[in-house]
Amino acid sequence: MNQCYGCTTCESADKPLEGFIKNLPLETSHHRVEGQSTKCAFGLQGVCCRLCSNGPCRITPDAPRGICGANADTIVARNFLRAVASGSGCYIHVVENTARNVKNAAQKKSGIKGEGALNKLAALFEIEEEDMYVRAEKVADAVLADLYLPEYEKMKLVKKMAYAPRYENWEKLGILPGGAKSEVCHGVVKCSTNLNSDPVDMLKDCLKLGISTGIYGLTLTNLLNDIVLGEPKLRLAPVGLRVIDPDYINIMITGHQHSMFTYLQERLTDADITEKAKQAGAKPD
């Protein structure tokens, strides 16, 4: 890429980052926005269906139903449920790995840095164990056991984690989730052609997935991460490109599998690694 796409493509509140992107000799997602500015009107409205080999079907005033008979409401809800199930699956995958990492650390009797977070979860789950590592393993097992329940068996930790009045409303609405992994499978299956045409029913499934994703994929992932990474502390810190310190080796890590970073957290402070950094020109501490 020899020139910038346009003067507004990379506009950002972070001016150093904006200038950096504008001068890159390659294409970034910021530049590709320009080429994708014209959107498919059917796709934007959610009334395009590509679920079966008879499609794609698009809903218009002259053709209000797809070949399978689904109307706009069904197609929109079906597309939405598939997207929600897919996203939920990603987050449940993360909390599963995080719980397994906590369990592995407990079994090795090392790597527990946030005992306060561990004690908080143990109290919530009503786990009483003197040994910290046994306590951590049982906390991890409680999370994993819930994830692996069948769809028709409600997860046990939801009530312990949720705000009580809200839990009562979920119970009245019939949207308490079963096993989180099974709920993802159930949601995908429900989207199949001719299996369900009730948009309200599919949207209720989205709410169930939202509960399991929020409590397990988000809240519990963070609390389990605190056990192995240590509990976070509020502090003032630079953001954007200002985090880069030219006196040191700068490594940027991104992703959701934070508990997998614990190895790097330890390894990068070892003497042989710090010596290599000094040899590369990093400032000695």
Cite the ranges covered by each PLM segment:
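Metallocofactor- and cofactor-centric catalytic cores in central/energy metabolism, strongly enriched
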Residues: 2-285
